[in-house]
């Protein structure tokens, strides 16, 4: 008979994977409790959560998760040593940036791999998406791009109106003298 606490842990991990299917796995050996708390706080700001995992239980939850069971996910030798899973709903680039920036200051945090939209990213993939703009930044860029022509037209019309006003003023002054 399986240990009830392990069954519960697998169920909890499956629930997390189904709610937040994108994730990063990172080694945290050597981080202090304060460091872990700081990292968790930064990750919460991005709408993600970090959980220290038991590797075998995470693998089992991954295989049983409805989001992931149709994918043959192979992370190779990633499952060695203590790992933390950082779960994200859809903002994995922002989460990856938080992890990458944190790892610059705290070398004990080592990004191992990630999983986003059905693809295993690997360490280099996670670091690459960390350089991408966030969803909010992309939306702002699109809005600026859409708004730019209208702004240019309005500016052009204002310049024409100002030139016309100056010309009328000049004619009025000339006729008035």
From Swiss-Prot:
Assembly mode: Part of the ribosomal stalk of the 50S ribosomal subunit. The N-terminus interacts with L11 and the large rRNA to form the base of the stalk. The C-terminus forms an elongated spine to which L12 dimers bind in a sequential fashion forming a multimeric L10(L12)X complex.
UniProt entry tagged with the keyword Zinc-finger: no
Entry-linked NCBIfam families: PRK00099.1-1 (NF000955)
Gene Ontology molecular functions: large ribosomal subunit rRNA binding
Record GO biological process: translation
Organism annotation: Leptospira biflexa serovar Patoc (strain Patoc 1 / ATCC 23582 / Paris)
Purpose of the protein: Forms part of the ribosomal stalk, playing a central role in the interaction of the ribosome with GTP-bound translation factors.
Protein name: Large ribosomal subunit protein uL10
Pfam families: Ribosomal_L10 (PF00466)
